[in-house]
Amino acid sequence: TFNVEKVTTVARHHETHASAAFYMSPFKEALIVSYDGGGDDGHFNVYAGNKDGVKPLDNITADFGGGYLLCGSLVREVAEKSRHQLALSGKLMGLCAYGKSIEKHVPAFQEFFFDRDYKKLAFLTKLPLKNIEDPWKNPLENWVFEGQEGYDIAATAQEAFERAFFSVLDRYDPNVPLILTGGCALNVLVNEKVKCLYNRPLYVPPNPHDGGLSLGHLFRYKEPTKQVDITYSGLPLLNKRTDLKFYVAKYNATKVTKKEIAELIKDGKILGLVYGDSEVGPRALGNRSIVCDPNIADMKDILNSKVKFREWYRPF
């Protein structure tokens, strides 16, 4: 038995995402969309944030996160080294730039994001419908596409993802600021289109994925009275008082000017630049950067193969 002396609060998955994002945002009022691969309260939830806190508006029947993940498993370039891993989504997003969306297939993919009925994608295979198995549980060679065909499937999935998302967003008041959170808010292609197509303030937290849930739970327990900006509150790379002195001595390091940095880049060098503390979340947002000259034709390939050790199609 356990002696419980204090009340334990339990916050639901998307409520926690929404709270973290709202209290980190600069907005006093906002429409909050939280969507990902799913939690105890669904996959796609909409909230209103205002002076009274974060309140639920809708639970949408959709699975954009799981659907997009499964689309990644259909493309060999994406799936062959990382099947069933969450990295599939980010890789699919990178690969889609090499393909062209197949317009006639977009509606089927759109429907797929709402119900994840894989049989709606049966036209992608040569198997009779009765022989189709769940490609997520039982990967079949017939489901895997490669080369330009695979790139086009990736582009089609991304296009359908965007249209499906906009079809939901258009149901709500366009005159209030918008906050996007949940793992799907890491799809920067969607975020950029929202920014360009919708004339409204937009905020995406640096940690919209599940790594931000603990902060959201804290905010639900004790609501902040002002914006909490933790974007650059991660760990420092070096302790200036101890580590920096050690490495300066070890490598006989000297201070460099901005002009010298520019000259090194001009000469084809690849540099790592670090400022202050690390960013919170999975994305580098300026305080830790790899910089190089993009005018060098094969620089992307050099970065991917020798520095980041990742797939050839990943962008800068």
Regions picked out by a protein language model, each given a short descriptive name:
Residues 8-11, 147-163:
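Short acidic-aromatic active-site loops that bind/stabilize oxyanions
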Residues 3, 126, 173-175, 252:
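Short, flexible coil/linker elements and helix-boundary hinge sites characteristic
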Residues 154, 158, 179, 203-210:
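Alpha-helix N-cap/helix-initiation motif
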Residues 177-186:
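Glycine-rich beta-strand-to-loop/alpha-helix junction loops that act as flexible
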Residues 155-178:
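Phosphate/ATP-binding catalytic cores across multiple sugar-kinase/actin-like superfamilies
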Residues 94, 105-156:
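Active-site cores of enzymes that catalyze phosphoryl transfer or operate on phosphate-rich substrates
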Residues 2-9, 15-116, 121, 186-187, ...:
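Flexible beta->alpha loop and helix N-cap segments adjacent to enzyme active/binding sites
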